[in-house]
UniProtKB/Swiss-Prot annotation:
Belongs to the RimM family. It comes from Natranaerobius thermophilus (strain ATCC BAA-1301 / DSM 18059 / JW/NM-WN-LF). InterPro entries: PRC_barrel-like_sf, PRC_RimM, RimM, RimM_N, RimM_N_sf, Transl_B-barrel_sf. One of its GO terms (cellular component) is cytoplasm. Signal peptide: none annotated. Residues 99-174 form the PRC barrel domain. This is Ribosome maturation factor RimM. One of its GO terms (molecular function) is ribosome binding. It holds the Pfam family PRC_RimM. Its main location: cytoplasm. Binds ribosomal protein uS19. It is found in: Cytoplasm. The PRC barrel domain binds ribosomal protein uS19. It comes from the Bacteria.
Amino acid sequence: MHPELDLVYVGKIVGTHGVKGELKVISLTDIENRFNELDRVYLVNEQDHYDPIIAHIESSFTHKNMEIVKFSEWDDINQVEGFHDWYIKIPREERPQLEEDEYYFDQITGLSVVTVEDEFLGTVTNIYQTGSNDVYEVSKEQDDKPILIPALYEVVKKIDLDEQIMIVDLPEGLLDEEE
């Protein structure tokens, strides 16, 4: 892959739809109608490490919890069948600007987590979307049992992307329950 490209995931191609070159895509973003807002994207095959292919979105719509995406470069099912399990990516700088105190998952994953008392808890290794609020999985070492921290204003006091740190004020008993 071109080292100068800093690409982020927006979708995964999981199959074809119809015979006119449309593809079924699982959206990897929670931005509604994301593919309608995009023009140029990069198709990436991470298994075979091909260079990204630039493609242009002609149209997209939602069907049975899938995005159906049509690229202007291809008009036939035979031309797109090989894209199964490829990813759709865009340059990081083309992501929409978020509101204050909103972050992309890749900005949170990897942050060091410390308490307001300056105790190091570990690193954010995963984020779970539970419906009511996200939950951050924090691990010190690979084999340690992770701590699950609710992504609530009462708990997460500060996120500093420049310093790569999250400061939390854990509810009483949370660490005791996790151990």
